[in-house]
Amino acid sequence: ARYADTNGYEKDRNRSIWPWRDWVIRALNADMPFDRFTVEQLAGDLLPNPTQDQLIATGFHRNTMLNEEGGIDPLEFRFHAMTDRVATTGTTWLGLTVGCAQCHTHKYDPIQHREYYQLMAFLNNADEPDLDLPEPTDEARHQARLAEAEALVAGLADQFPIEETVWSTPTLAEARSQRGSPVRLLDDQSALFTGAAPDTDTLTLVVTTKETHIDRLRLDTLLDEALPKKGPGRVAHGNFVLSELRVTAAPLDAPDQKRKVALAHAQADVEQSGFPAAQAIDDQLQTGWAVDVGGDRLNREHHLVVRFQNEVSFTAGTRFEITLEHQQAAQHLIGRPRIRLGRPSPDPRPVAERRKAAAEAAFQRWLQQARETAVRWTPLRPTAATSNLPLLTSQPDDSVLASGDISKSDTYRLTFKAPPEPITAVRLEALPDPSLPRHGPGMAYYEGPKGDFFLGELNLNAGGQPVRWKSASHSYGKNAFGAEATATLAIDQDPQTGWSTAGREGQRHEAVFIPETPIAGGSELDLSLLFGRHYACSLGRFRVSVTSRSGGATARDLPNDLEPLLMVPDAALASGLRDRLRRHFLLTTPELAETQKRIAQLRQRPAAKTTLVLRERPTDNPRPTFLHRRGEFLQPAERVEPGVIAAIAPFPADLPKNRLGLARWLVSSNHPLTARVTVNRQWQAFFGKGLVKTTEDFGYQGESPSHPELLDWLAVDFMRNGWSLKRLHRQIVLSATYRQSSRIRPEHLERDSENRWLSRGPSVRLEAEIIRDSALRASGLLSDTMGGPGVYPPQPSGVTEVAYGGAAWPTSLGQDRYRRSLYTFTKRTAPFAMFNTFDAPTGESCLARRDTSNTPLQALTLLNDIFFIEVSQAMGRDLARQTGTVSERIRTAFQRCLTRPPTAVELQALESFWNSQRARFRAKELDAAAVAGPGEVSGETPLEERAAWSALSRALLNLDELITKG
């Protein structure tokens, strides 16, 4: 099945497909009939009303590798995955080297080149989504968290911050720059500094006020068209670093009596990492306050509030002189500062009442502003929609849903009929959808964040003429790789830059584009959206709308159903609708950010475990399959339809030409291969060799069966008895053939040296996983826990670190350390060391028959591997606890390791070995503590004896008989 917990190839990142492995275990333990086992794995999603387990079962063919290297074509490696699926299907059910027909007609077997691709066509028409597997308790937990979130929403107004301070704007009397930058005093009492920004500067603002009892100061950093990106700073990107803020005060009627104002505390609306507000008043010029917190929050107005240690109050009024030092970073200067002064609020009302009043007042201000900028959007339904690969389908809400394959460079082309009115703005909404990875809005599924998209360029033609854009805005923008990801970058004619919403998958976002001149109404609109970067990242669901509003529009995070409410006059707005607007305000206003963050966390559905599955594509969007000359991805020829290998068995006319039909054909009663191949593989598991030795090749290049009549009888009996694997296993192990002694006599070597005629019982080396599990069982450490993600048992350090990225191996603790080998985490590029040493496959391709080698490293592994040392120490502790004689305990250990009692000679040799080891430990020739390992044994057992038992266990675990069956 080529199971692995990672994707393979260079990056070999982790994947979640262990639920399929657990399904296989449950199915085998329940003795699921093999014909049903086949159908559910190949086509469980095509069964009527498939269960979750039947969907999980389709993960069989998701065990293919996935290449996430930056320079590859994902469609090419999807083709390679398909060739792997065809080859695996051929090996597993047909026992044929079908893969040899990928490049040409099979040289030996009756498999046509065309038939290979017809077989591929059955498997090729499937999408490859992740399946969420929520726990039964997840929904109840989610509902409880939603109820908690609603309780917080209901109390938002009660938490609204109130101004303990009454703010006033003093008169700006003077503003100057130490470096001589030009300055203008503006009507709002701010100062605008312009001209070429010096590397460092000291700005001085002098303000006067008649207010008394001043206990704090607020520095506003305002935006202005004269500043780079409107500011608030004078450096190219608009940031600033305020190294130090100092304040002096003097009576208005005695300005020469100024004194320094001691500053107690500083707090800002935003703080750049490493540049907190407190550093603006720490008397250190090499530190400071800055506001670049990422995204589009930089180029906004910000403020810093500084509290005084003592009130400043002069009866005649006060003259304040504020010094703003900018010494920390070149040109990082505030461009348009304004000073406000605060005094304690005299409001006598209860705090709760004041909070509600403040919330309502803020809501009214927001509502007024929102109404002034409200936009009536008209959604456009495309009259035509095409792309390089995905199918674009119009939805009832006028959105467009993309489905199917995507490439690293994809262009959507859509045609719309414009409304009669001139268009002043075009809106592109990126919408979530449950069919998309992580619910979208993008289709990215590898390399980048799942659900991501990257719009490199947006172009619009109106009436055949290109539209020139004036500006663009977005509700949210973030780049998963690189710097900015803004809507403006989607209209800069550079496809390497663009708009993305990484980090907020599963949410709605929008971008608004303003044309230089209004677009003529009634014209035909041709929109092209270019998606692409080093991974496939097309948009999965979107909607295009336009408006004729004078002045255009700006993108904002406002649900579509609320925008029309802003058009309703206040008197006509029903209380319930007004409450919806108030609720939205409370959930988005910056004053309640902390509580909003908690609400968002509570509303988020708990992350469910996932697994990889297949999902048949819709009938209106089948994936075509082509014959590829010489098996080359880049040489597709004519299209082929699903079909089987004619020489095997005809395809019944009543079966559908899809994966379900293929599965039914494979397990049909007249199919000559599936039952034979399956029973042969089971025979191999017990005898070491199949009745057909070449388990993977029943063709002309394979070996003929040693007992053809037996193979035929077993196959027919297997089908007649419900395809029961457990019955077949019981049948084999209870047979006189299997129960023979495996002892080799001289006549065996002469007439049947390889035991092809079954003249004796099987004697074969155990597989790597069984060797490890046998050691765990013998030591008493084996955990019977079933299911769950892969675990990380101990192995030598550095095994995984040599693979790409230096992946760590977080060694499991507790019971997970000693789980069955079946549950060991499998990394394709760095296989578990002990398994690799004992010839286990890496999961890169289907393997019906393992090679068996004998190397010195295998003996060294059994002797020195950290796992076998732990096992021998655990077994030694257990033997030391027992109360029998030395001989009795040796018999116990021998029976546990080799499942038979020792002979007298073996017992004597082992007892002599135990005594000699104990003597060496007593003589300090060996380190008893190191050999015995950690742990205490109750009673009076000396450390030397416990170490001797560990040494004896280690010797038993290194015997050839332990790793050999028979």
What are these regions (language model features)?
Residues 229-243, 331-337, 438-456, 536-542:
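Short coil-to-beta strand junction motifs in C2/discoidin
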Residues 149-152, 162-202, 206, 225-227, ...:
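Disordered, acidic Ser/Thr/Pro-rich linker "stalks" and the adjacent N-terminal cap
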Residues 2-48, 152-160, 316, 368-370, ...:
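Primarily short, surface-exposed interaction patches in extracytoplasmic proteins
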Residues 221-223, 323-330, 430-432, 528-535:
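Short beta-strand-plus-loop segments that form exposed binding edges in beta-rich domains
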Residues 200, 210-216, 313-321, 419-425, ...:
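Extended extracellular/luminal ectodomain segments enriched in beta-structured repeat modules
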Residues 3-20, 66-73, 122-148, 345-359, ...:
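Short His/Asp/Glu-rich catalytic/ion-coordination signatures at enzyme active sites or charged loops
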Residues 46-147, 350-354, 537, 556, ...:
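Sequence context surrounding c-type heme c attachment/ligation sites in exported
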